[in-house]
From Swiss-Prot:
Keyword NADP in record: no
Hydrolase recorded as keyword: no
Name of the protein: Exotoxin type C
Gene3D superfamilies: 2.40.50.110, 3.10.20.120
Sequence positions that bind Zn(2+): 194, 228, 230
Length: 235
């Protein structure tokens, strides 16, 4: 009987300790919004690599090595890391366009990006996007023609960057004094589907590599299927 009572007491103490500690663990695991903004402001204050009609030197199961000599000089290249499924769509000597954000920079030989690759497109186009902005659930001015894309096939990385850049320039979403604490982009297609992009996601240590790794899938969209974008910001 004594043994049973001791076991009960130990069990009760354990439950109390767990319930006391759990909230602390939860709050510590969530990165403070000021740190998230700081990470994202640093990561996206960047000039993207925007190169046209470059040749693929070689490909592996997860990497494309792309010749950018005509832009950067002899023996200069871009190394694009991507998922296996994405990399299999390209092969050696393919001509591609690059729009990517570097996470490692080696000024002597090349840059390292995630995804950011589309087939080379020689036609000149101007797609002026239709967009809407909502702040704390209230509709603001429309953002029609604020974002322009100059290719028929683009990566979500390019759309994401250009919309973020507009928001950073005009709404200061990542500034320390910014009132915004969460937000997302929703990209609508003509078949009624929606793709979401979290505007306040800074995983792991919040390095450029951590933040840009989501572009490994090299997701693309044909602008013939693009409908509009919606931005939702919360204070």
């Amino acid at each position: 009987m004594k043994k049973i009572n001791i076991i009960k007491i130990v069990f009760i103490i354990t439950v109390i300790l767990i319930s006391t500690i759990s909230p602390i663990i939860k709050s510590d695991s969530k990165k403070d919004i000021s740190n998230v903004k700081s990470d994202l402001l640093y990561a996206y204050t960047i000039t993207p690599y925007d190169y046209k009609d470059c040749r693929v030197n070689f490909s592996t199961t997860h990497t494309l090595n792309i010749d950018t000599q005509k832009y950067r000089g002899k023996d200069y290249y871009i190394s694009s890391e991507m998922s296996y499924e994405a990399s299999q769509k390209f092969k050696r000597d393919d001509h591609v366009d690059v729009f990517g954000l570097f996470y490692i920079l080696n000024s002597h030989t090349g840059e390292y990006i995630y995804g950011g690759i589309t087939p080379a497109q020689n036609n000149k186009v101007n797609h002026k996007l239709l967009g809407n902005l909502f702040i704390s659930g209230e509709s603001q001015q429309n953002l029609n023609n604020k974002i322009i894309l100059e290719k028929d096939i683009v990566t979500f990385q390019e759309i994401d960057f250009k919309i973020r850049k507009y928001l950073m320039d005009n709404y200061k979403i990542y500034d320390a004094t910014s009132p915004y604490v969460s937000g997302r982009i929703e990209i609508g297609t003509k078949d009624g589907k929606h793709e979401q992009i979290d505007l306040f996601d800074s995983p792991n240590e919040g390095t450029r590599s951590d933040i840009f790794a989501k572009y490994k899938d090299n997701r693309i969209i044909n602008m013939k299927n693009f409908s509009h974008f919606d931005i939702y910001l919360e204070k």
